[in-house]
Amino acid sequence: MATTTTPRLKTKYREEIAGKLQEEFSYENVMQTPGLVKIVVNMGVGDAARDSKLIDGAIRDLTTITGQKPAVTKARKSIAQFKLREGQPIGAHVTLRGDRMWEFLDRTLSLALPRIRDFRGLSPKQFDGRGNYTFGLTEQVMFHEIDQDKIDRVRGMDITVVTTATNDAEGRALLRHLGFPFKEA
């Protein structure tokens, strides 16, 4: 299902952002410019330990949002306090690369984030020290692909943006140029 046109954000990155970043950090080589590698969307369904049907709703939601079938995350070991057995499905995740990644990022930044109630921006402190950024969304209905009448329950998700940046300053600059609405510290 490859699109014939280049995604809007990818074009903007290639034509404008890459040049700005190269000037800003004065790179000697074009390949040193930070870029996006992949986006991982993770949906943990802890209640699936008690009711295995709940994982189907998470898979359906993730497929609708990302356009890609998610991989089911299984428990690595048994934990009696959580009534969890090894190998039991406890979540689902999708790894997006290429054009699908750019399209998803564009939809998230321009459509989903503005639909969050009382949204004041993303925290600028959630970088991992290597230029990758992770943020959480509390409900899946902020994506317009999800029909609000058909959801069985509200589920949150974690979205990790993996970049080629070597430190947080480069990663923050890349994501700010791409249009991430960071809160001012």
UniProtKB/Swiss-Prot annotation:
UniProt GO MF annotations: rRNA binding; structural constituent of ribosome; tRNA binding
Source domain of life: Bacteria
Keyword RNA-binding: yes
Record GO cellular component, one term: ribosome
Gene Ontology BP, a term: translation
SUPFAM superfamilies, sorted: RL5-like
Keyword list, A-Z: Ribonucleoprotein, Ribosomal protein, RNA-binding, rRNA-binding, tRNA-binding
InterPro entries named in the record: Ribosomal_uL5, Ribosomal_uL5_bac-type, Ribosomal_uL5_C, Ribosomal_uL5_CS, Ribosomal_uL5_dom_sf, Ribosomal_uL5_N
Pfam family, one: Ribosomal_L5
Disulfide bonds: none
Family: Belongs to the universal ribosomal protein uL5 family.
Subunit structure: Part of the 50S ribosomal subunit; part of the 5S rRNA/L5/L18/L25 subcomplex. Contacts the 5S rRNA and the P site tRNA. Forms a bridge to the 30S subunit in the 70S ribosome.
NCBIfam families: PRK00010.1
Function of the protein: This is one of the proteins that bind and probably mediate the attachment of the 5S RNA into the large ribosomal subunit, where it forms part of the central protuberance. In the 70S ribosome it contacts protein S13 of the 30S subunit (bridge B1b), connecting the 2 subunits; this bridge is implicated in subunit movement. Contacts the P site tRNA; the 5S rRNA and some of its associated proteins might help stabilize positioning of ribosome-bound tRNAs.
Protein name: Large ribosomal subunit protein uL5
Lineage: Bacteria, Bacillati, Actinomycetota, Actinomycetes, Kitasatosporales
